[in-house]
């Protein structure tokens, strides 16, 4: 008899987005001609930047010539891409990050789950509530939790509520924790963290010898010059933080797949006996064993993001989506909703009307407006009573969707 990983059986009924898909498909079976507009899953809609496409076409041609053909690449990523990332995304902002500390991957979603491979099972883990579900589910799969209660909260995790009262930025834990997930700009709430707030987290982590997992997948959407783009802009962060980044949303790579993780050399964890161990070495070992690297063609496309043309085209994409976010905020406010986010992030977080439950409001929006959002309750118990809308869609669809909402609710 082959035994399964019983931790998977602790997972709640279904990952959030498959459950949304199930409800939408059920609706479409009953209403096949409904003009549905999807503002739920944060998938991009606009084409890859021309600079990236041109670089990838050139790379494909190189793969057709024996003299320039590439086989297996370095597991950590090609040096020319890592050097561009280090220079443009970190050193240009005063961050002391070297190319050797950057690991290219096929997605930050993968990395935020895979990073657990190098950490032990006895760590006390803190997540915000609401939270990107992957952080919680991967810890459940790894056996780091007990069972979930009726609110969907897993025993063994420390939940840090983020609410309108604390501006959707969690207060520091009242107890020592070892691993802390932070996401800014935040998914799902669209909130950002000030320099002072991030400094408090770094100080806490250093005091308790904890590690911050800092997900900066949406940093390109920050419009406020006072808001840090990287945790490494904060003094002391090299001693306590791992940062995750992605090309998915800023450059439209959701279907192309390229991201990176930063693990500073000198960042340490410890063994049960108390010996210090460098995390960079463990992650490098993990990646070289379990990962063969991102394709040469895709990495050339990612490199083009940092060209002069690529930078201009990425800014154009980001500006396009942020204008969508502005329109969503404006129209929802006009319709009488309490609205958050959408200023430094491509997500708008709205309070459901009249105390309606998140899934009830999801269904009402679907059936009344033919608009798909993401129920806040799917991100955690503290997300109940909210719904997330994504700015990732065409301008035409965003305008039409908001007109429907205003007509239905204003």
Swiss-Prot record:
Lineage of origin: Bacteria, Bacillati, Cyanobacteriota, Cyanophyceae, Acaryochloridales
Transferase in keyword set: yes
Cofactor: pyridoxal 5'-phosphate
Residues at which pyridoxal 5'-phosphate binds: 72, 108-109, 132, 187, 218, 246-248, 257, 292
Native species: Thermosynechococcus vestitus (strain NIES-2133 / IAM M-273 / BP-1)
Protein's recorded name: LL-diaminopimelate aminotransferase
Catalytic activity: (2S,6S)-2,6-diaminopimelate + 2-oxoglutarate = (S)-2,3,4,5-tetrahydrodipicolinate + L-glutamate + H2O + H(+)
Family listed: Belongs to the class-I pyridoxal-phosphate-dependent aminotransferase family. LL-diaminopimelate aminotransferase subfamily.
Pathway: Amino-acid biosynthesis; L-lysine biosynthesis via DAP pathway; LL-2,6-diaminopimelate from (S)-tetrahydrodipicolinate (aminotransferase route): step 1/1
One of the GO BP terms on file: lysine biosynthetic process via diaminopimelate, diaminopimelate-aminotransferase pathway
């Amino acid at each position: 008899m082959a035994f399964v990983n019983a931790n998977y059986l602790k997972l709640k009924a279904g990952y959030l987005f498959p459950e949304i898909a199930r409800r939408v498909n059920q609706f479409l079976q009953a209403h096949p001609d409904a003009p549905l507009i999807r503002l739920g899953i944060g998938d991009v809609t606009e084409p890859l930047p021309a600079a990236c496409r041109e670089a990838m076409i050139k790379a494909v041609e190189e793969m057709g010539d024996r003299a320039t053909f590439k086989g297996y690449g370095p597991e950590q990523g090609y040096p020319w891409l890592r050097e561009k990332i280090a220079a443009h995304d970190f050193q240009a902002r005063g961050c002391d990050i070297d190319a050797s500390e950057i690991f290219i991957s096929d997605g930050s979603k993968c990395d935020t789950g895979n990073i657990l491979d190098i950490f032990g099972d006895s760590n006390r883990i803190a997540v915000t509530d609401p939270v990107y579900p992957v952080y919680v589910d991967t810890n459940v799969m790894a056996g780091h939790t007990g069972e979930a209660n009726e609110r969907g909260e897993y025993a063994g995790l420390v939940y840090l509520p983020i609410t309108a009262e604390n501006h959707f930025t969690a207060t520091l834990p009242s107890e020592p924790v070892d691993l802390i997930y932070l996401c800014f700009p935040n998914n799902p709430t669209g909130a950002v963290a000030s320099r002072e707030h991030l400094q408090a987290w770094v100080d806490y982590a250093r005091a308790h010898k904890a590690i911050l997992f800092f997900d900066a997948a949406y940093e390109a959407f920050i419009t406020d010059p006072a808001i840090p783009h990287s945790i490494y802009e904060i003094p002391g962060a090299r001693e306590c933080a791992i940062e995750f980044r992605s090309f998915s949303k800023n450059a439209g790579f959701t279907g192309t797949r390229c991201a990176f993780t930063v693990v500073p050399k000198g960042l340490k964890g410890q063994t049960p006996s108390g010996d210090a161990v460098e995390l960079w070495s463990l992650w490098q070992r993990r990646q070289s064993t379990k990962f063969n690297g991102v394709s040469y063609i895709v990495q050339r496309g990612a490199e083009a993001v940092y060209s002069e043309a690529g930078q201009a085209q990425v800014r154009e994409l980001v500006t396009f989506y942020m204008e969508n976010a502005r329109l969503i905020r404006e129209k929802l406010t006009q319709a009488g909703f309490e609205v958050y986010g959408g200023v430094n992030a491509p997500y708008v977080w709205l309070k459901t009307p009249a105390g309606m439950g998140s899934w009830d409001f999801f269904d009402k929006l679907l059936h009344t407006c033919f608009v798909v959002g993401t129920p806040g309750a799917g991100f955690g118990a503290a997300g109940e009573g909210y719904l997330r809308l994504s700015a990732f869609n065409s301008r035409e669809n965003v305008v039409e969707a908001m007109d429907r909402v205003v007509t239905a609710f204003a």
